Amino acid sequence: MALYLGVMSGTSLDGLDIALVEQGEQLELLATHYLPMPPDLRQDLLALCSSGPDEIARAALAENRWASLAGEGIRQLLARQGLKPEAVRAIGSHGQTIRHEPARGFTVQIGNPALLAELTGISVVADFRRRDVAAGGQGAPLVPAFHETLFSQLGRRLAILNVGGFSNLSLIEQDKPVHGFDCGPGNVLLDAWIEREHGHPYDADGAWAASGVAQPGLLSALMADPFFAGSGPKSTGREVFNLPWLDRHLANLPAYRAQDVQATLLELTARSIIDSLGKAQQGTEALLVCGGGARNGALMARLGQLLPAARVASTGAYGVDPDWVEAMAFAWLAHCCLEGIAANRPSVTAAKGLRVLGAIYPA
């Protein structure tokens, strides 16, 4: 038995998820902690997702702040649990993705794991994606192997859907290797559009989207992006799907009500997921949803409408809190690294072979 911490900061940049887990024969979630992202740090990280001046210094300063925030959250969680740093074997830190371009041979996550190890007194495992990219893979998604470990006993033909900033599927079938890929935008465009139009960080329960009407012309234009035509392995990020991308499409179409654009973006998220699933897996028994999208009632309802033959439910219905699956995954990835266990899946990322992921920063 060993304790691990997983730290996850996704493309939504809303905050840091920290999970304390116990790794034995099975993985058990013991405690969680959430720290909101300071608005100025969020803006700095968002700015680093596209080209700009003085990027190296800006990235270095931002990752120091990210590590300091993560360190503070870890100290708070350990204090609440009455644990000393030496009780934890390692921290699995995803860091913050600022660029992801595997076709050009690189992916960049920042978070200064050396500083995080120094601040916490706990060994840190980080930089999980680059080894897979070095082996010719997409570097994403990395969670399908964890989903397989966590959920494979629940059925013969399952799909695990993570909806964060982007959506990705893990396809689990008995006696077959796990498959997985990114489907497209999850919450990233929904969040960006409502933030620009109303100043809200996200569309609570999808209520604003539900007040609008999806526009077929806009949806067709968005779905014509080449990314959606490809089959997995594939991954994507803010480099492709962002507000300028949406604005370019809107500029060529009639003016729409803002809520109708939001409704169309929700339909884009739902359709890209179900279309991707239909291409890759037939006879899906259940679609289990985790990530922020599991809390979006309008999205969950639409997924159920588009996939009537399967059970569509939050992972919470199966005893796994949907908000903490990814943080748990990076705790598990740290365990795999320290034990020398390969944690990528070539059937997911198209890497040349199995690889041990992560770099170790001793306490």
UniProtKB/Swiss-Prot annotation:
Q: Which domain of life is it from?
A: Bacteria
Q: What is its EC number?
A: 2.7.1.170
Reaction catalysed by this chain? 1,6-anhydro-N-acetyl-beta-muramate + ATP + H2O = N-acetyl-D-muramate 6-phosphate + ADP + H(+)
What Gene3D superfamilies does this protein map onto? 3.30.420.40
Q: Where are the transmembrane segments?
A: none
Q: Name one GO biological process term.
A: 1,6-anhydro-N-acetyl-beta-muramic acid catabolic process
Looking up SUPFAM superfamilies in the UniProt record yields:
Actin-like ATPase domain (SSF53067)
User: What is its pathway?
Assistant: Amino-sugar metabolism; 1,6-anhydro-N-acetylmuramate degradation; Cell wall biogenesis; peptidoglycan recycling
Q: Which Pfam families match?
A: AnmK
Keyword annotations for this protein?
Antibiotic resistance, ATP-binding, Carbohydrate metabolism, Kinase, Nucleotide-binding, Transferase
Q: Where does ATP bind?
A: 10-17
InterPro entries in the record: Anhydro_N_Ac-Mur_kinase, ATPase_NBD
MF (Gene Ontology): ATP binding; kinase activity; phosphotransferase activity, alcohol group as acceptor
- The answer to whether UniProt assigns keyword Iron-sulfur to this entry is no
Keyword Nucleus included in the entry's annotation: no
Gene inactivation effect: Cells lacking this gene accumulate anhMurNAc and are fosfomycin sensitive, in contrast to wild-type P.putida, which is resistant to fosfomycin.
Q: Would you identify the family this protein belongs to, as annotated?
A: Belongs to the anhydro-N-acetylmuramic acid kinase family.
Q: What does this protein do?
A: Catalyzes the specific phosphorylation of 1,6-anhydro-N-acetylmuramic acid (anhMurNAc) with the simultaneous cleavage of the 1,6-anhydro ring, generating MurNAc-6-P. Is required for the utilization of anhMurNAc either imported from the medium or derived from its own cell wall murein, and thus plays a role in cell wall recycling. Contributes to intrinsic fosfomycin resistance in P.putida.
| PANTHER family per UniProt | ANHYDRO-N-ACETYLMURAMIC ACID KINASE (PTHR30605:SF0)
What is this protein identified as?
Anhydro-N-acetylmuramic acid kinase
Provide the species name.
Answer: Pseudomonas putida (strain ATCC 47054 / DSM 6125 / CFBP 8728 / NCIMB 11950 / KT2440)
**Gene expressing this chain:** anmK
